[in-house]
Amino acid sequence: MQGRGWIAAAVFLADRITKLFAERFLRSAVTLIPGVLGLRPARNTGMSFSLLSGHPVLLGILSLGILTGAFLALRKKKLDSVSQTGLMMMLGGAAGNLADRLLSGYVLDMIEFLFIRFAVFNVADACLVTGCGLLIWNLFRGKENG
């Protein structure tokens, strides 16, 4: 995995810690930065940003697909550091949310932007989206390899 496995591990660990904190201490919405950022516990039976709620089998297959695809892509010998980082972020995020689904039957979301109407999300979701963004950016730069 070309030496960046720590990124996936860090994402997974950060996701688990924030979810355990939210599960234990976050009972209702809390504003961190007025009008900008807050925390609000929400049980999500869907995937990132509540998409596909009520389809647990499809979500499990999709999570396994992301994990498998990221793992296979990381086995590629000439993958640049941006692509490696993006894939590791996706791997850690997918593993974090899959662990929730397997352990609880739902994913705990808690991060909320207050200045726009948007879904509540978690660290794993943010890393999945950021990792995808890095891969797309790299593709447009023409740097997905070497």
Language-model regions, residue ranges each:
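Alpha-helical transmembrane bundles and membrane-interface segments of multipass inner-membrane proteins
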Residues: 1-146
